[in-house]
Design a protein with these regions (language model features):
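Active-site-proximal segments of catalytic enzyme domains
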Residues: 1-2
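Histidine-acidic metal/acid-base catalytic patches
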Residues: 5-13, 19-171
Length: 171
C-alpha cells in the first residue's frame, strides 16, 4: 500500500514529474482498480521550471483515452498547469484548457466500444485497422461545432493579445 492508500487520500499523478520514458497514461487504468477517485496534475513535462503549458499532444490524447475508455469521467479529477514565465498567462490558460477539452472530445469520438469488443475477441488485425482508421476521423469538424454551440471563436489569440496590449500593459 502506498501513502495515499494508507491515509485514505487521493493519489495524485503529476505528469510533469516522471522519468522521460515513463508516461502517466499507462498508470491510470491500474490505479482506478484500487482507488475510487484519482487526481491528475496535467502539464507538459519539461526538464526545467518553465513551459509547462498543456498542449494537445500524444500523451494528453492517451490520458484522455484512458479516462473515457474506463468510463472514469467522474472518477478522475483533472487539474491543469499553465505556468510559463515567458508567455501571456491568459493565452497559456486558454491553450491548456482547450487542449484538454480537445483531448477528451477526441477520446469520446473514438469507436471505444467496438475496439473493446475486438480486443476481448482477440481480433487484433481488425483492431489495428480500426485504430489507424480512427486517426483520420473528422475530429476538427466536431470540435468546430462544439465551439459554435458554446458561442466561442476558434481564434482566442487575437482578443487576448488585444487585451494584453490595451489593459495588461497599462498595469
Amino acid at each position: 500500500q502506498n501513502y495515499a492508500a494508507k491515509k485514505g487520500i487521493l493519489c495524485l499523478m503529476d505528469m510533469g514529474h516522471y522519468h522521460p520514458t515513463e508516461v502517466v497514461s499507462e498508470k491510470i487504468s491500474s490505479l482506478l482498480c484500487f482507488y475510487d477517485k484519482l487526481a491528475l496534475r496535467v502539464s507538459r513535462p519539461v526538464r526545467w521550471d518553465s513551459d509547462h503549458v498543456v498542449i494537445f499532444d500524444d500523451e494528453l490524447k492517451e490520458v484522455a483515452k484512458e479516462i473515457i475508455r474506463n468510463h472514469a469521467e467522474d472518477k478522475v479529477i483533472i487539474g491543469l498547469d499553465y505556468f510559463d514565465a515567458s508567455i501571456n498567462r491568459l493565452v497559456a490558460w486558454t491553450t491548456g484548457e482547450r487542449s484538454m477539452e480537445k483531448a477528451l472530445l477526441y477520446a469520446a469520438l473514438l469507436p471505444n466500444e467496438e475496439m473493446k469488443k475486438l480486443q476481448d475477441n482477440a481480433e487484433f488485425s481488425k483492431l489495428l485497422y480500426l485504430q489507424e482508421h480512427a486517426k483520420m476521423l473528422p475530429f476538427d469538424a466536431v470540435y468546430q461545432e462544439y465551439l459554435t454551440r458554446q458561442g466561442l471563436e476558434e481564434d482566442y489569440f487575437t482578443p487576448l493579445h488585444q487585451y494584453e496590449e490595451e489593459v495588461l500593459s497599462q498595469r
